[in-house]
Regions:
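Short beta-strand edge/turn micro-motifs at domain boundaries
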Residues: 8-14, 18-21, 135-168
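Intrinsic disorder/low-complexity detector
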Residues: 71-72, 151
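Short, low-complexity N-terminal intrinsically disordered segments enriched in polar/charged residues
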Residues: 5-68
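Hydrophobic, Leu/Ile/Phe/Ala-enriched alpha-helical segments that form helix-helix packing faces
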Residues: 66, 103, 107, 152-156
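Compositionally biased, intrinsically disordered/low-complexity regions enriched for serine, proline
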Residues: 4, 39, 105, 156-157
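Amphipathic repeat-derived elements
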Residues: 31-52, 117-118, 123-126, 148-150, ...
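Short solvent-exposed beta->alpha transition segments
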Residues: 57, 61, 72-137
Length: 168
């Protein structure tokens, strides 16, 4: 056999190779579509989809604790520190007493009353974070806008004047 002699063409091997490549490409495409659906169908680059997914999860956990009136646990989610009670002085900018005034069902500052249900209506990028519009107690308008910071996994109120448009 010389250097210029080509090996015999193996049709079965070529067919297996093509089936493998097309199957792999199809599987990766299906995986990408499922990831996009689970992340909430964000209109953003794929490398940001996990931020939407984690932001929705954190907001759902936070509001579930508020619905159960477990404000201590909800505050831990808000500041992303489960053991916040061991060092409360570290969170002097937004202390637990002020958090209770904002989120308690009997608080005069809580314009939604006792929070019983919630639904994330929309999520979008804002700066480095994810802005989430949440409809409280079955409302169709006047959503609660929360910002999720993917760097430190904490929640915050949306900046003044910044809210997601839910339509007419």
């Amino acid at each position: 056999m010389t250097l210029l002699d080509a090996p015999k063409f193996d049709a079965a091997r070529e067919q297996r190779r093509q089936v493998f490549l097309y199957s792999t490409a199809g599987f990766l495409f299906v995986l990408l579509v499922v990831w996009w659906l689970v992340a909430g169908r964000p209109v953003d680059w794929p490398w940001n989809w996990n931020n939407y997914l984690f932001g929705r999860s954190v907001v759902n956990n936070f509001l579930s604790d508020v619905e159960k009136n477990d404000l201590a646990s909800a505050y831990g989610i808000w500041i992303h520190d489960k053991n916040w009670q061991q060092h409360p002085a570290q969170y002097g900018a937004y202390p637990f007493a002020r958090f209770q005034e904002d989120w308690s069902s009997t608080s005069p500052d809580n314009e939604y009353g006792a929070i019983q249900t919630h639904k994330i209506a929309l999520a979008g990028r804002y700066g480095n974070g994810v802005l989430l519009a949440v409809l409280i107690n079955g409302r169709k308008s006047k959503a609660l806008n929360l910002e999720y910071d993917p760097k430190n996994h904490s929640l915050n109120f949306a900046p003044p004047g910044v809210e997601l448009y839910l339509g007419p």
